[in-house]
């Protein structure tokens, strides 16, 4: 989960301007049966197409964010024809030797993750997952002859990203959360370690996969506690049909409505 949180490329939330104060979303379906798998990768580089995973961690929770079962932690043995990025090893503290000693083959590693994320009703979620971790998963599955996309939509499964929820909370409902400033004074920092430190949330070791997962889950619980309607509204938008419904699609251009769009495409000084 490289920290691109201040200016990642795309995605966000839209909201009709005349409905900003009426967040009464229909409950996501199926509201009573889905579970979240909060997960994170540490990798041997930042290129999701070329670089390989080093470590994976995950925690499954119910819809109320209560943990289910034991956390998952796994290491992946690097391929013999692959050279890890030394800078990535310095950042994470994970070496190829450690992964060779503790890990399993990439095929077994991929199969384990696929079983976890493809369990019916699972919503895969994390911090910056849509732009990084999910891409790592897709290329990992592709290399190991697993359908890269099936776990994202089959059997009631889906995916979500807490980073966009954090942006929406700052822009629309900032009360109850302490928002740290970026070191350069350019606005709020959405880096996970900055947010956890500012809000007194445990984050023992940034760039350790399980520590990052627990920090992400703690931040999600805080937002859900302080802004429950916004949390439920944003979660509902992980489904394409709910997005289309919210946008009023399909509609003719003459009936299009103005929207407030919250996205990493826009700088924070513009309220996004």
Region annotations inferred by a language model:
Residues 20-27, 221-272:
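Acidic two-metal-ion nuclease catalytic site recognized across multiple nuclease folds
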Residues 91-112, 116:
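Metal-dependent phosphoesterase signature
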């Amino acid at each position: 989960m490289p920290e691109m949180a201040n200016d990642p490329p795309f995605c966000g939330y839209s909201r009709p301007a005349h409905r900003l104060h009426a967040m009464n979303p229909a409950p996501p379906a199926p509201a009573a049966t889905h579970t979240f798998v909060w997960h994170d990768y540490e990798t041997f580089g930042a290129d999701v197409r070329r670089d390989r995973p080093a470590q994976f961690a995950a925690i499954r929770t119910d819809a109320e964010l209560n943990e289910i079962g034991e956390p998952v932690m796994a290491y992946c043995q690097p391929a013999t024809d692959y050279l890890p990025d030394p800078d990535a090893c310095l950042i994470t503290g994970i070496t190829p030797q450690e992964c060779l000693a503790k890990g399993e083959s990439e095929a077994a590693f991929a199969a384990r993750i696929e079983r976890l994320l493809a369990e019916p009703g699972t919503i895969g979620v994390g911090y910056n997952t849509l732009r990084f971790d999910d891409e790592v998963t897709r290329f990992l599955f592709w290399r190991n002859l697993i359908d890269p996309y099936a776990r994202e939509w089959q059997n009631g499964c889906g995916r979500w990203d807490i980073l966009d929820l954090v942006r929406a909370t700052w822009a629309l409902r900032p009360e109850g959360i302490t928002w740290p400033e970026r070191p350069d004074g350019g606005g709020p920092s959405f880096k996970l370690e900055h947010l956890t430190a500012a809000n007194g949330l445990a984050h023992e070791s940034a760039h350790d996969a399980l520590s990052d997962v627990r920090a992400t889950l703690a931040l999600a619980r805080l937002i859900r506690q302080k802004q429950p309607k916004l949390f439920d509204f944003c979660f509902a938008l992980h489904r394409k049909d709910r997005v289309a419904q919210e946008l009023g699609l399909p509609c003719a251009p003459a009936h299009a409505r103005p929207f407030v769009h919250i996205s990493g495409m826009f700088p924070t000084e513009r309220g996004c």
